[in-house]
Amino acid sequence: MKTLLLALAVVVLVCLGSANQLGLGRQQIDRRQRQAIGPPYGLCFQCDRKTSPDCSTAKKCPWYHTTCYTLYKPDDACGEEWAVKGCAKTCPTAGPYERVKCCYKPECNND
């Protein structure tokens, strides 16, 4: 029983170590240069007005998705309102009667 627990502990430690090497753990910071080490990621608000109208928490984006965007669509009052907020590698293209606003700083699509 003790050997089984010891083997399980070793497997957990090895898996956690490999997760950190893959960048799945905490973001590492180079203290001297004050920069993040490893693949860049964005921190954007990600939601759809139809499924979650309250978009109050920013989420970590996938690797290299550093562009935050807000997609606006026409509303009933002849104006426009946001329809989708998210992150992408590059700024998405707006469709007909749509407008996309892109930004490149963490949590910048909170409007």
Swiss-Prot record:
Expressed by the venom gland. It is found in: Secreted. Residues 20-34 form a propeptide. The modification Pyrrolidone carboxylic acid is found at residue 35. It comes from the Eukaryota. Residues 1-19 form the signal peptide. GO terms for molecular function: acetylcholine receptor inhibitor activity; toxin activity. Pfam families: Toxin_cobra-type (PF21947). Keywords: Acetylcholine receptor inhibiting toxin, Disulfide bond, Neurotoxin, Postsynaptic neurotoxin, Pyrrolidone carboxylic acid, Secreted, Signal, Toxin. This is Sulditoxin subunit A.
